Amino acid sequence: VAGVNLRRVFFVAVGGTVGTAARLALGMLLADAGVVPVLVANAVGAFLLGVLTARLPAATDLRLLLGTGALGGFTTYSAFMTGTLSLWADAPLLACAYAAASLVLGVGGAALGLRAGRPRAGGRA
């Protein structure tokens, strides 16, 4: 296909498969925890995306594999929305708290990841 870099598509697909499988495993481990597995996956994923953003140039194959692929598959907006709507039916206040916590943990995790991933004085992280 003209204009499509199939090697990069492959890296994203492989990473996405691994990330999605990891999220499924997390959900199985915390099966009785309601929306907690999605909250954990999104917060941890945001932190790790922050670290990757600070550490790896945007156009590298490794960043595509780990960031767009693996962490893109590990984190999930659709499950976040499904969980929010599920909570809304019986507990609208809890749904709002979950949505707010997801936003705060996501942005906070990404900011902490960026900070953790940046080299410190002396060139070492």
Residue ranges and their predicted role:
Residues 1-125:
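Membrane-interface helix-loop junctions in multi-pass transporters/channels
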